[in-house]
């Protein structure tokens, strides 16, 4: 192999695939363990630094493989400690990744696609349309970049304790790559994050949710956002294909396979005058009866292309009270990082807009020097 483009990126390979890769080189499978630790635990991307492998193997790896993460094009920390990155992937596409610190916990919100095809009416990402799925290397690369940003650090004081697949895209529409990336998150030789602390959020691709339960036992979040099909059809068009009853039945099946008594998280974006009334909350109580779950209320974050409005905090708390009194543990998501960005999906759009303007300016200057 001669071109760098032909090299295999090892960053997204879980242990089993990396072992198979080394076998094709005529090497023992334990080499995969060594490389996993170098890449993910130590943040190394240079084979020459992997000093517990022979020089000849390192030279061979440089010929056929690479360790390549996303390029950081934006990195800023808000007053409340929230840190946001825009990372450029292959083909010049960008995604955003957000780290939310909360005491001893650090939750990283990771993207699975560039854009999104679901076109949920309250989501700014969907307005950009769908471009492509991220590779496993591009997904785990977001964790890799974020972790490296804090190196060196005390192993007992890890900056990333939780990962949520809640960024741009629908994870279950990028099934294989998302599963590979989550396996790396939970791999003891890589990030060693507990399966309870890795959460996949889905709008409800029911067949893929059933398939997910056969291959992993990460925590589950359901993007519900409405207490009935009529309203959810308007907010989440996917509901027309997989209505609420089918989605909640699949959620029950998934939870029944877990080895522990874990609950699903029900995500509910609260939109003024749309789904924020006490009667909506009471309808939700009936809908979720018997489902092991907790509820996370997300006050709508306005963005330019939407006519929806953020509800008052009083309205959101009234909604919460109905659910709490019915016995559901219900929290209101705190808006973080307002001073550096607003809703998910807006930051990357603004950065790409600036990039396009810069490219147009350069092109004009080249034509008219």
Curated annotation (Swiss-Prot):
Residue span(s) of domain Radical SAM core: 102-338
Primary location recorded for the protein, binned into one broad class: cytoplasm
Molecular function terms, GO-annotated: 4 iron, 4 sulfur cluster binding; metal ion binding; rRNA (adenine(2503)-C2-)-methyltransferase activity; rRNA binding; tRNA (adenine(37)-C2)-methyltransferase activity; tRNA binding
UniProt remark on cofactor binding: Binds 1 [4Fe-4S] cluster. The cluster is coordinated with 3 cysteines and an exchangeable S-adenosyl-L-methionine.
Superkingdom of the organism of origin: Bacteria
Cofactors named for this entry: [4Fe-4S] cluster
Record-level GO BP terms: rRNA base methylation; tRNA methylation
EC number: 2.1.1.192
Compartments, record wording: Cytoplasm
Alphabetic keyword roster: 4Fe-4S, Cytoplasm, Disulfide bond, Iron, Iron-sulfur, Metal-binding, Methyltransferase, rRNA processing, S-adenosyl-L-methionine, Transferase, tRNA processing
Record family assignment: Belongs to the radical SAM superfamily. RlmN family.
The name this protein goes by in its record: Dual-specificity RNA methyltransferase RlmN
Gene: rlmN
